[in-house]
């Protein structure tokens, strides 16, 4: 038995897919399990890698991976055995969720610009920031309904972290409470 963690599950027909990571010596390895059978996706030789979210569309399996390279954390997507880098490799980036709608693939997370983490959405590999970058923020989940794309996350303004909802790129602030969002 090895240390590891599962972070996402997807059921397609009678197949159960999970993703996460498993420790392999000095490094963590991103893995995909289909009905309990593991496939190594990335990592394990010179870097750590983690599977964060997955989706299945027809026969295509997609996994969002974060690879902790020696200098920066990089967002990648694994599709049927092929790994593609989504984020700028010259800065830190994180991704937490994926959604598929038709032939469109959406991934959300954040990317560091200077010293600020800016919420970001990637559609078919093309990234778009969701805020101006004036404040730290994250995008945690994406959902597509028809032609509408919904993203939830947070943005820190001063000492308060606000819950945010974006619909088709338009930001809304959820009703304010007395405490920080979580």
PLM regions with names:
Residues 1-182:
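Residue-level hotspots at or immediately adjacent to binding/recognition sites across diverse folds
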């Amino acid at each position: 038995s090895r240390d590891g963690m599962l972070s996402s599950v997807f059921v397609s027909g009678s197949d159960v897919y999970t993703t996460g990571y498993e420790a392999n010596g000095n490094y963590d390895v991103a893995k995909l399990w289909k009905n309990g059978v593991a496939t190594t996706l990335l990592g394990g030789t010179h870097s750590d890698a983690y599977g964060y979210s997955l989706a299945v569309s027809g026969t295509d399996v997609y996994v969002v991976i974060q690879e902790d390279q020696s200098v920066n954390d990089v967002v990648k997507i694994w599709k049927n055995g092929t790994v593609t880098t989504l984020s700028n490799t010259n800065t830190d980036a994180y991704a937490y969720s994926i959604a598929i709608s038709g032939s469109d693939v959406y991934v959300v997370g954040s990317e560091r610009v200077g010293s600020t983490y800016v919420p970001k959405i990637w559609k078919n590999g093309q990234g778009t920031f969701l805020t101006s970058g004036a404040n730290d923020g994250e995008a945690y989940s994406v959902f597509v309904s028809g032609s509408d794309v919904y993203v939830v996350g947070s943005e820190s303004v001063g000492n308060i972290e606000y819950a945010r909802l974006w619909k088709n790129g338009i930001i809304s602030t959820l009703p304010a409470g007395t405490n920080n969002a979580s």
